[in-house]
UniProtKB/Swiss-Prot annotation:
Residues 21-55, 363-398, 437-470, 529-562, 576-601, 615-719 are annotated as: Disordered. The modification Omega-N-methylarginine is found at residues 363, 681. The gene is Larp4. The modification N-acetylmethionine is found at residue 1. This is La-related protein 4. The keyword RNA-binding applies. RNA binding protein that binds to the poly-A tract of mRNA molecules. Associates with the 40S ribosomal subunit and with polysomes. Plays a role in the regulation of mRNA translation. Plays a role in the regulation of cell morphology and cytoskeletal organization. It comes from Mus musculus (Mouse). One of its GO terms (molecular function) is RNA binding. Residues 376-389, 460-470 have a biased composition (Low complexity). InterPro entries: La_dom_prot, La_HTH, LARP4_RRM, RBD_domain_sf, WH-like_DNA-bd_sf, WH_DNA-bd_sf. PROSITE patterns: HTH_LA. Residues 439-448 have a biased composition (Basic residues). It holds the Pfam family La.
Amino acid sequence: MLLFVEVTSKGTGLNPNAKVWQEIPSGNPDGTPVTEPSWHETAATSGSHPEGHTELSEDMCKEYEVMYSPSCETTRNTADVEESADGMILGPEDLSYQLYDVSGESSSAISTEDLKECLKKQLEFCFSRENLSKDLYLISQMDSDQFVPIWTVANMEEIKKLTTNTDLILEVLRSSPMVQVDEKGEKVRPSHKRCIVILREIPETTPVEEVKALFKNENCPKVISCEFAHNSNWYITFQSDTDAQQAFKYLREEVKTFQGKPIMARIKAINTFFAKNGYRLMDSSMYTQPIQTPTQYPSPVFMQPVYNPQQYSVYSLVPQSWSPSPAPYFETPLAPFPNGSFVDGFSSPGSYKTNAAAMNMGRPFPKNRVKPHFRSSSGSEHSTEGSVSLGDGPLSRSSSRIFLSERHNPTVTGQQEQTYLPKEAPILQMEQNGDFGRGRRTLFRGRRRRDDDRIPRPQPAATEAKAPTPKFDLLATNFPPLPGSSSRVPDELGLENRMSDVVKGVCREKDSEDVRVSCPVPAEDGQTDCTSAPLSISPSPPCTAEPPVLSTTQQEQDQMEDSAVPKDTLNPVAVPVSSPTATKPSPANTASPCTSNINPPRAVALQEPRKLSYAEVCQKPPKEPSPVLVQPLRELRSNAVSPTRNEENGAPEKPVEKPHEKPETRASKDHSGFRGNTIPRGAAGKIREQRRQFSHRATPQGVTRRNGKEQYVPPRSPK
């Protein structure tokens, strides 16, 4: 034998030998090559004794030596050269090892049973769940039915070491209960048969012999194994699915009881043989985590509640906190990566953002946060023009808020209007503080109130003029227009002023009835003129003051306010509404009563106030009761406002009705106009003035807030 091995090892350098190995799967189990006649002869001799290598005579060995020893030497040398040329390091040892396997295979045929046993163990291991969870190659070779070609199995290194005889491999596979061979004998797959019977409620202390004794019966097939699993469960394995079914039926129908208890049995599939998906799940758990996402998905879902509290807390603080919610959902698909900390990692950034929002309190309305800066810049520009810069920022904001109030007020009675105005005052104060000290918390509160106002206000908006409604809707519902309002002073401020005029008309039932200012304020001088020119009162049309373009000094504004103050009728022309807007040179846009439509460009604006005036007209009946209520409210506001104004401290306590009488001093005028106008008018211009005054002092805000809250506590509790 040794001599034969050596001789054949020399011959392994021949190319025909390599071809022999290539032809093994094709059904040449004996490795019989036909390329060269000499090799064919020797191979035929060896093939003629497949089981009798022990019978190989020394003559055969000598024949090998005689025939091949010289050629083997040359072929070996040439083979070495070729291998070196190819950069391969296949030494003769490897070839002899392979050849030894071939000879070993044929020699092991002597003990076929041993070979079959080894093959069976190896094949069953290859198709075991443990191996399938790691053997990606074998899984990749499976088709949709988990069938693997038998030649693929035969080519596996572990099998080749044992045998290359596909017929023998097929025979072993067919004899194994662990695998299933197709009818043609070409493919094999793991067996899905349920071969295990589970006995429940049998204590672990029960001897194995007693459990096995249950199945010792003619009607029960042979038990392959019996073992205790866990939780008083015993696994009894049978050879096949049919055996397990038969044993199960036997227990149910014949035995029925064990140890005085009814037998609780069920059939379980051998966990080694689950469907392909089962292998993939196992595989994914050990290797590919992305495939594991289905199993991991419950964990993100479970962890979601951990994240939700933050969402809700954020939501309570910030109405727009829905923005963080999408992020978690975008992140959750990534969460399946087993480290659940990833979810926590994401949530922590979210919490950080929410904290930042809580600190700034302006985050929910980032555009609003930017607004103050725009207004401050615009205010600086106005200051260069000679108008009070601080007023502009608050004016635009207040105008927007007044606009909201106006939208709501047209349908509201005078009392409600009064209650609303006090609320507006604290808001204005807050925003003044925002402009003065950039206190964003106050700004946020003001905006919050604005939102509160906005929620109910959209309903009465229907009463507004049809033309302005689109812009009003944009202002009310969409924040983007609000920042634009600062930049677009002429358009949006005009709208705001008109609205404020409407509000003025609604609230100034008592004041505006007597006098209506019809003169448009051309400029600072023009404003004085308008103050001096009261017109006959036409209560039906509310004055449509569109002075937003006017940017005048406080004196002019005061004069305007004075002129507006004498108005006792619901039709306050709201000339004072002319706010210190950036454009002084546009006097044509100054307030003009609806009756005297002096400015044709205001036709649109007039139309808007006309409808508003209609609402005012509807509200005119409450004019009479309202004067009494409005006056005390004015006094309260004047009290609150007077301390707030540092510039004009002299006139903090002056009565509201007298403001028109006080054109002498700007401070008194401003206060009077402010007091008189704040409650009834809600005019953006006056509110702006108020904001200027407030901006000088931050402390009086608390007082005004108190007054406003006290006045309208029943309707609302702004926070």
